[in-house]
Amino acid sequence: MNPVRRAALVVGLVLAVLVMVFATREAVRDRMTTHLVGAVAPPVAGITLDGTVWDIDDQRGRWVLVNFFSTTCVPCIEEHPELVAFAEVHDGSDPAVPEVRVVSVAFDDRSSAISRFFGEHGGGWPVLPADTGRIAVDWGVVAVPESYLVTPSGHVAAKVVGGVVREDLEGLLNRGLAAVAGDRTGS
């Protein structure tokens, strides 16, 4: 086989493999599961960017959305307006809408980059910088963004791998609310 044909064959094979990898990547990510759903949420605690102490255990009685992100992650940047919109609707100002506390945990970022990111993109919720220890490990975070919806009793109701969409978060919250209501009525 002449060298030009061999090179073309190698390039073609490499491209075919890349297409297969990227074509199936999203499907694999969507099927990722976690042992945490239904379990008590692992610890999320630390000093936030604004210097206050935040601990998920202090949020018992409230819904919490724990979001793992990075300021350099494109899907994290793309999901951020969705998180902002969700947080604004669920800020507790409307008694007809369930309150959900959002907390973000930065993944491998500097505090200055995180502050700049939130300054540019909005979001008034607590943010734990990357130096908070083993939080991502305890939650089993594989890649950012990942988000977890936690019930008022402190149990993980759902995991979202990849960027969130507000409507999907609303659906997860509604299913969680229905499950909690079912638990209360014994059904």
Model-derived features: positions:
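Thiol/disulfide oxidoreductase modules built on the thioredoxin-like
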Residues: 116-124, 130-187
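N-terminal targeting signals for export/organelle localization
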Residues: 1-43, 185-187
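Hydrophobic beta-strand core positions in alpha/beta domains
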Residues: 65-67, 104, 149
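Structural microenvironment flanking redox-active thiols in thiol-disulfide oxidoreductases
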Residues: 77-121, 131-138
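Short active-site neighborhood of thiol/selenol oxidoreductases, capturing the structured segment around
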Residues: 54-77, 83
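Short loop/turn microsegments at loop-to-beta-strand junctions
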Residues: 41-42, 64, 144-145
